[in-house]
Curated annotation (Swiss-Prot):
This enzyme's EC code(s): 5.3.1.16
Protein name: 1-(5-phosphoribosyl)-5-[(5-phosphoribosylamino)methylideneamino] imidazole-4-carboxamide isomerase
Subcellular location: Cytoplasm
Protein origin, superkingdom: Bacteria
Family named by the database record: Belongs to the HisA/HisF family.
Keyword Membrane among UniProt keywords: no
Cellular component GO terms, alphabetical: cytoplasm
Pfam families assigned to the protein according to its UniProt record, in alphabetical order: His_biosynth (PF00977)
């Protein structure tokens, strides 16, 4: 099980939101690249970046910061937030990012997913499914759709997708533990590589997720608040 330390970027800074609320922000660092270096130093084998401004604006906003992170660390990086066009994807990959996460666009236009998988390959494209009580949320979490998350994942699988970041937004940034039940459903019913995200607060949460066979876990606030020591966690779960 791979652990992905999360770096959320807003106005060029490393921040955390509570439950995806853009007005509820905590700033952790003015230099996100330093944070990336810190996580790499503690054993991170992959880093997860979200351009929060991008997610809201619908186009890339913090590319300079992302580029700086890519140039600072040697581990691979995945990026999400505001990536909606083929040009966006090309641009991100040209910055040196290893793979991109597509969210809203996948819900709105499955044909686009098919196209980008055939253009870039399934290893470069991750689909982000954000859900609230099993239903898909879109547009930077501002709207909840009438799409069931598992159905959407299965539809993506048909299109050639192999990896999904599954976020339960009722849990995100709240440190209340992940939604094991819905995540397990995702793993069992889709057979895809599921990267769990949202609510991870302790080593116990990581054990629970490891048991249900997720392929990875994104850890945010719990790392910043030292509830999980990345070095220990990596040693336990990535070996």
């Amino acid at each position: 099980m791979r652990l992905y330390p999360a770096i959320d970027i807003r106005n060029g800074q490393c921040v955390r939101l509570r439950q995806g609320q853009f007005h509820d922000v905590e700033v952790y660092s003015h230099v996100p690249a330093n944070i990336a270096m810190q996580w790499e130093g503690q054993g991170a084998s992959y880093i997860h970046i979200v351009d929060l401004d991008g997610a809201l604006a619908g186009h890339s906003v913090n590319d300079e910061v992302i580029k700086e992170i890519v140039q600072t660390v040697s581990v691979p990086i995945q990026v999400g937030g505001g990536i909606r066009t083929i040009q966006d994807i090309e641009h991100k990959l040209n910055l040196g990012v290893n793979r991109v996460i597509i969210g809203t666009k996948a819900v709105e236009n499955p044909q686009f997913v098919k196209e980008i998988i055939s253009t870039f390959g399934a290893d470069k494209i991750v689909i982000g499914i954000d859900a609230k009580n099993g239903m898909v949320a879109i547009e930077g979490w501002e709207k909840v759709s009438n799409y069931n998350a598992v159905s959407l994942a299965l539809e993506m699988k048909e299109l050639g997708v192999s990896t999904i970041v599954y976020t339960d937004i009722s849990k995100d940034g709240m440190l209340q533990g992940p939604n094991i039940e819905h995540t397990k459903e995702m793993v069992d019913l889709t057979g895809l590589n599921i990267i769990a995200s949202g609510g991870v607060s302790s080593m116990k949460d990581l054990e629970e997720l490891d048991k249900i066979k997720v392929s990875g876990v994104i850890i945010g606030k719990a790392l910043y608040e030292r509830r999980i020591e990345l070095e220990n966690a990596t040693r336990l779960f990535e070996q």
